[in-house]
Amino acid sequence: MEEGEAKKTGLEGTGLSLPGSSHGNLRSAGSDQQLKQMLDSLKSSKSPAVINYGASWCRVCSQILPPFCRFSNEFKNLTFIYADIDECPETTQNIRYTPTFHFYRDGEKVDEMLGTGEERLHDRLWLHS
C-alpha cells in the first residue's frame, strides 16, 4: 500500500470486481461503527434488509459476493449490506460461519442462512422481499 493511500474496506477491500447497485440499495460496512449505524437505521426504518457477513480470506464468500451484488439490482426494495467480520470484530463476534446471511423485517432479524448457493440465496431473498 502506498503511503498516504487509504486502506480499502468493505466491498472495496475484497479486491474483487463486483457489479454495482444501480438502485443505491447496496451498502458496505468497513468498521464496527458503520455496521452499528446501519443496524440502528434498519431498526428505525423497518424496511426489509439482508446482511452478508463474510471475510476477505473466505473463498466461498468471494464466490457468493458477485451474485449478492447482482441481486441488489433485482430486489430493489431490500437493503443489501456487506460486513467483513475482520473489519467489524465487535459487532460480528457471534458470527461463527462465513458466509452468514441475516434477514431483517420491521427492524427485527427474522431469518438466517449459513453457507452459500446462488439459487438458495435468490430464493431466500425472494421470500423476504
UniProtKB/Swiss-Prot annotation:
Active site annotation, chain numbering: 58 (nucleophile), 61 (nucleophile)
Record lineage: Eukaryota, Viridiplantae, Streptophyta, Embryophyta, Tracheophyta
UniProt-listed Pfam families: Thioredoxin (PF00085)
Location of the Thioredoxin domain: 7-129
The protein, known as: Thioredoxin-like 3-3
Keywords in alphabetical order: Disulfide bond, Electron transport, Redox-active center, Transport
Biased composition (Basic and acidic residues): 1-10
Keyword Cytoplasm on entry: no
Keyword Transport attached: yes
Family per record: Belongs to the thioredoxin family.
